[in-house]
A protein has these predicted regions:
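Functionalized membrane-embedded alpha-helices
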Residues: 26-46, 72-113
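Solvent-exposed, non-transmembrane interaction/regulatory regions
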Residues: 20, 24-27, 122
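Membrane-embedded alpha-helical segments of integral membrane proteins
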Residues: 108-162
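Membrane-interfacial entry segments at the cytosolic side of transmembrane helices
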Residues: 99, 160-165
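Short, Lys/Arg-rich, polar N-terminal cytosolic tail immediately upstream
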Residues: 12-22
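Perimembrane loop-to-helix junctions flanking transmembrane segments
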Residues: 53-70
């Protein structure tokens, strides 16, 4: 004869296990989505680094910082490398925490920039994905908000779920 108390414990354990599996699924899905976005963005920009340089120069010009234009090529390669590296680190789990920090820092810089671009509309295209995918300024901002939410989720879940092996 089954004890009702044991049955409640079994149901509770099943609920806890399902909750853990759902959290694990969300963690890995978020990691793949953020990582793939950064890898794709870095890869597309790497195909045409001069195009990225010109886009950075456009941004510097509308912000009245054209005297930084000489550093646009260096900034282009730094951005390409940072995006691609952040994505690869998240996807491959080689150094997940570094990838999470790098993607967080990129989004801390890019989200306010895209909000300003969406409100003021100084450039027609953000250049997030080079010439492969052209997004409106507001679409870019909302894409960044989604990435921010996913990255916050990764920060919240990583302590409980992250296992490098």
């Amino acid at each position: 004869m089954l004890c009702p108390l044991n049955r409640k414990v079994e149901i509770r354990n099943l609920f806890i296990m399902a909750k853990f599996q759902f959290s694990t699924f969300i963690f890995h899905l978020s990691k793949l989505l953020v990582g793939a976005t950064f890898v794709f963005s870095g890869f597309v920009k790497a195909i045409d680094p001069l195009g990225t340089t010109y886009k950075i120069q456009d941004y510097l010009e509308v912000m009245h910082l054209s005297w930084f234009s000489e550093l646009a090529l260096v900034a282009s390669f730094a951005l390409i490398t940072a995006e691609f590296l952040a994505g690869m680190l998240l996807i491959t789990n080689v150094n997940f925490k570094l990838g999470l920090w790098l993607s967080s820092l990129l989004m801390i810089a890019m989200t306010p920039l895209t909000l300003w671009i969406a409100i003021k509309n100084p450039v027609t295209d953000c250049g997030c994905f080079g010439d492969a995918i052209i997004l409106s300024n507001w679409a870019t901002f909302w894409k960044n908000i989604v990435l921010d939410v996913l990255i916050i989720g990764l920060w919240l879940l990583q302590k409980r779920l992250y296992n490098p092996w």
